[in-house]
């Protein structure tokens, strides 16, 4: 039986978005999937999902910066899950204005339409990067915000904008703040796919940036489960909720772990092109799961290094 709830999903063709789309369809949600328009008619990861799932959804091609397009296509939806964003940190140093246009103005367009159409739930995606390097661990939602890159700053601004619509217009906003999601379909620009791919190709050398920084990695299937739990949860309205493992690991440790699984020695070569500006490097992130456990009854299925094995 199809759910009466119809989700407008931005960023549906991406890494997390494609997994979330499949998860929602599996739970009988109606989904209208926004795919970023491009001249190649490329639908990203949606090109790889099974035909049955693809036939069950409605796909629209456009841009979150195009307000008229959004107004036309959100009319028949009552839930917005907003994943679309420019996310590459290195590129944000070169093209900060693009991040303002997409991550802030694009979010504003969606919020305005959600307000006018009285959307029943607006789920906005944040990032743990807005916290900057951990000042204490585990990091709860009250941790100071110190964005250390133009990307993080644009996401922090979008977060504040989303929450302002909750306070100003009573828009039912929930902000999900994931800590380093990883898993199948992730871009090869990300560190874990880079390490795993080079190991698979039997390379004994891996070129990486900073290797002593620590992150809290969350498997993508756990992350999409948290998104869905927010849809029907009234207690999550007006809240920002961290989604992480409460388990930190350095990039060097991931290489060592991958080396043991692949049964080959891997040497790390420092690549200056992959190193962030010194004051921009986030050295440590580790999430508190207190609020996600309390409000969403959520906890990661793939704990510790088990997600790395699956990846």
State each model region's role:
Residues 114, 166, 199, 230-231:
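Hydrophobic pocket-lining residues that define ligand/cofactor binding sites across diverse proteins
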Residues 137, 188-198:
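A glycine/serine/threonine-rich, flexible loop-to-helix segment
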Residues 43-46, 159, 193, 252, ...:
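Short, surface-exposed alpha-helical segments at coil->helix boundaries
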């Amino acid at each position: 039986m199809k759910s009466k709830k119809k989700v407008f999903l931005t960023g549906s063709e991406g890494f997390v978005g494609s997994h979330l789309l499949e998860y929602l369809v599996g739970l009988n949600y109606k989904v209208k999937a926004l795919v970023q328009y491009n001249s190649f008619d490329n639908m990203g990861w949606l090109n790889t999902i099974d035909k049955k799932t693809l036939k069950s959804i409605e796909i629209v091609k456009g841009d979150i910066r195009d307000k008229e397009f959004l107004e036309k296509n959100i009319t028949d939806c009552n839930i917005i899950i907003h994943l679309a964003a420019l996310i590459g940190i290195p590129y944000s140093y070169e093209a900060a204005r693009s991040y303002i246009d997409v991550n802030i103005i694009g979010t504003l367009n969606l919020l305005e339409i959600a307000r006018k159409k009285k959307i029943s739930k607006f789920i906005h995606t944040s990032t743990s990067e807005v916290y900057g390097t951990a000042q204490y661990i585990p990091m709860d939602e009250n941790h100071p915000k110190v964005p250390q890159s133009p990307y993080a700053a644009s996401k922090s601004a979008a977060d504040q904008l989303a929450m302002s619509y909750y306070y100003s217009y009573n828009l039912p906003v929930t902000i999900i703040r994931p800590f380093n999601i990883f898993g199948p379909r992730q871009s090869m620009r990300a560190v874990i796919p880079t390490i795993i791919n080079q190991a698979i190709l039997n390379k004994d050398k891996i070129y990486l940036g900073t290797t002593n920084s620590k992150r809290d990695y969350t498997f993508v299937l756990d992350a999409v489960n948290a998104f869905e739990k927010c849809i029907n949860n009234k207690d999550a309205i007006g809240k920002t909720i961290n989604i992480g493992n409460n388990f930190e690991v350095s990039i060097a440790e991931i290489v060592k772990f991958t080396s043991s699984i692949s049964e080959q020695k891997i040497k790390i070569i420092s690549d200056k092109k992959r190193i962030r500006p010194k004051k921009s490097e986030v050295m440590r992130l580790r999430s508190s799961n207190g609020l996600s456990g309390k409000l969403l009854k959520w906890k990661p299925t793939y704990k510790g290094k088990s997600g790395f094995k699956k990846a």
